[in-house]
């Protein structure tokens, strides 16, 4: 179920934080880097899935409306052009990851890009708007 899957990431975050605090208290720098990586993975999984659950619709989606529709038409030429680019980002992933539509706050524009695995490797200044889970279990 969705809640069980998501709970695994939340538990992973909490476990990584506890282990990270212990490693810092003991001055174990090698363990600090390992636990920071684990924290990034589980926190990325939590954040990515939180956005994804909100993107899902029980009856499927349709074209966006309002400001988002206007921005897509303006920046991609049409919804069909956006969908083709977004689909290419999703299908072009090597291994596990996510396809993302994000808002670039610095450039004031929409971007499509890929996230690898669960790492929170979102470019600086980007707000993820739409994510598609491309992990093999999805």
Curated annotation (Swiss-Prot):
Keywords: Manganese, Metal-binding, Oxidoreductase. It catalyses: 2 superoxide + 2 H(+) = H2O2 + O2. One of its GO terms (molecular function) is metal ion binding. Its cofactor is Mn(2+). Mn(2+) binds at residues 2, 49, 133, 137. Its EC number is 1.15.1.1. Pfam families: Sod_Fe_C, Sod_Fe_N. Binds 1 Mn(2+) ion per subunit. It is an enzyme of class 1 (oxidoreductase). InterPro entries: Fe/Mn_Superoxide_Dismutase, Mn/Fe_SOD, Mn/Fe_SOD_C, Mn/Fe_SOD_N, Mn/Fe_SOD_N_sf, SOD_C_sf. Gene3D superfamilies: Fe,Mn superoxide dismutase (SOD) domain, Iron/manganese superoxide dismutase, C-terminal domain. It comes from the Bacteria. Destroys superoxide anion radicals which are normally produced within the cells and which are toxic to biological systems. Belongs to the iron/manganese superoxide dismutase family. This is Superoxide dismutase [Mn].
